A protein has these predicted regions:
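Extended extracellular/luminal ectodomain segments enriched in beta-structured repeat modules
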Residues: 64-70, 80, 198
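Basic/polar, cationic surfaces and motifs that engage anionic cell-wall
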Residues: 9-18, 135, 139-206, 238, ...
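N-terminal export leaders
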Residues: 1-2
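Active-site acidic/histidine clusters and adjacent loop/turn architecture
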Residues: 187, 195-231
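Ser/Thr/Pro/Gly-rich low-complexity disordered regions
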Residues: 376-458
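Short proline/glycine-enriched turn/loop motifs at strand-loop junctions of beta-rich domains
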Residues: 75-80, 124, 134-135, 409-415
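C-terminal region of N-terminal signal peptides and the immediate post-cleavage residues
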Residues: 9-42, 370
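Beta-sandwich interaction modules
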Residues: 8-13, 58-66, 82-84, 89, ...
Length: 458
């Protein structure tokens, strides 16, 4: 069975298909290795693709040492292949996952490479790549990453929220620093650049998967940082800040969290803005209230320092994007989505639809600080942590059965309930951990939503 973990609450899904389990090529596995002193193992290698059907190119199934993130890069930004990757995990091959092209990039560095998002598959030991739309771009390379978790990834304290003693301003929310997520400062190149002002906050998503646990977040950011600097050739991680799916804020690009550091996140508009990216894919998943609260609190703090109105608009000059030519004036929302400035689906339709809520949250924070009232930062919600996500097992054919391969959660002993879905709609009465497939399921996407609770935690 090809299985992928879905999004939202914990979920898993399969699509019925005739694709057989691929046979691995003979020979040794591709081996990842880490630089001296680094805990991020990596491998970059050329790809040999063969035509499988009209217009479809595919690699062999390649055995590897353990990796958890995969991406594909190439030389020319004008090339736009449709890249799909699947990974072999402990429960078998994943479904094919489309890796979107990274639309974030520096404004003024033509030497950087182009590539897909680095997708979080979790621990895997084989990989296969497919191009559904060719030809293959020049200089195509497979990138595999395995950022190891550290014992102290969840032990580092957050930065304390700062409260101004002068003119009331929106308070700084809790932010985990680069040191706390383990940035190797030797990877970045040159000194940070700062902007004159901050006119906007651009909201992104990393399109890197939604199945990471709280304890895996710092390692995932280290892997993303390694990919941005070593594989794509950027001077640093592209985003000024990141927000994880649990509502925690992390420092991104170096230069000081209180400074207007120039990032590499919104082509054509990096010199007048701050960029924040939510870790995950929000074309698939809806953002939690913890994410919306974190985005609002962060935007309020950064914008209020420059007297910007979170619910307003501003007019800025583009330095050149695929939507606004260099020198063109653009009137945009002060808090906008990446798609407002560039030809991209970022930050995903489900997160984009919540940007008004982010604006309202930021407005309320600023209004409260103006009135001299204390602004309580939203508490991190008590949630059940996903140590190992649930998977789908079984045989994906009519007359056969699927079952939930139960995950591991924090705390131990959390109880799970199930709802099977057909093309996203609940299947009446199917709430057991097993599901028998019928003819009505042929060619349909069958998923299971797994909701796990422990007391008041979900």
């Amino acid at each position: 069975v090809a299985a992928t973990v879905a999004v939202g609450a914990v979920g898993a899904a399969v699509r019925l298909s005739q694709d057989d389990d691929p046979k691995l090529r003979p020979g040794g596995a591709l081996a990842l290795s880490a630089d001296d002193g680094s805990d991020v193992a990596a491998l970059e290698t050329g790809l040999r693709l063969q035509e499988r059907s009209s217009g479809v190119l595919q690699s062999e199934a390649l055995p590897t040492s353990t990796y958890s993130m995969a991406a594909v890069t190439w030389a020319r930004p004008e090339d736009r292949p449709e890249v799909l990757v699947r990974a072999r995990r402990s429960d078998g091959w994943s479904d094919w996952t489309r890796l979107p092209v990274v639309e974030d990039r520096p404004d003024d560095d033509p030497a950087v490479r182009t590539g897909t998002a680095a997708w979080w598959f979790g621990p895997s030991d084989a990989v296969q790549v497919r191009l559904s739309r060719g030809p293959a771009p020049k200089g195509m390379r497979l990138v595999l990453l395995h950022p190891a978790s550290r014992p102290d990834d969840e032990l580092s304290p957050r930065t304390a929220a700062r409260r101004s003693t002068g003119t009331p301003k929106a308070p700084r929310p809790d932010i985990r620093t680069r040191k706390q997520w383990g940035a190797d400062e030797s990877w970045r190149d040159g000194s940070p650049r700062t902007n004159r002002t901050i006119e906007q906050v651009h909201v992104h998503h990393t399109v890197s998967g939604n199945t990471y646990s709280r304890k895996e977040t710092a390692a995932l950011i280290r892997g993303m940082y390694r990919y941005h600097t070593k594989s794509l050739g950027w001077s640093d991680i592209g985003y000024n800040f990141l927000v994880d799916r649990f509502g925690r804020i992390w420092e991104g690009r170096a230069g000081g969290i209180a400074q207007p550091v120039r990032g590499a996140h919104t082509l054509g508009f990096n010199d007048t803005s701050m960029g924040v990216s939510v870790i995950g894919n929000f074309e698939q998943a809806a953002p939690t209230e913890a994410i919306i609260d974190a985005l609002g609190a962060l935007a309020a703090w950064k914008l209020d320092a420059y007297d910007r109105r979170p619910r307003g608009k501003t007019t800025v000059e583009s330095t050149g994007s695929d939507k606004y030519a260099a020198g063109r004036m653009a009137t945009l929302r002060v808090i906008d989505g990446h798609r407002d400035t560039n030809d991209t689906a970022c930050p995903g339709s489900k997160l984009y639809a919540r940007l008004d809520d982010v604006r309202d949250r930021a407005h309320r924070v600023i209004k409260a600080s103006r009135a001299g009232r204390p602004v309580d930062e939203p508490e991190e919600p008590e949630v059940v942590g996903v140590v190992e996500p649930a998977r789908v097992g079984g045989v994906a054919k009519p007359g056969k059965g699927l079952k939930v391969l139960k995950g591991r959660y924090d705390p131990d002993g959390a109880r799970s309930s199930y709802q099977w879905l057909r093309d996203g709609d609940p299947i009446a009465g199917e709430t057991a951990w097993r599901y028998r497939l019928g003819q009505a399921d042929l060619g349909r996407r069958i998923a299971v939503q797994v909701t796990t609770r422990s007391g008041s935690r979900t």
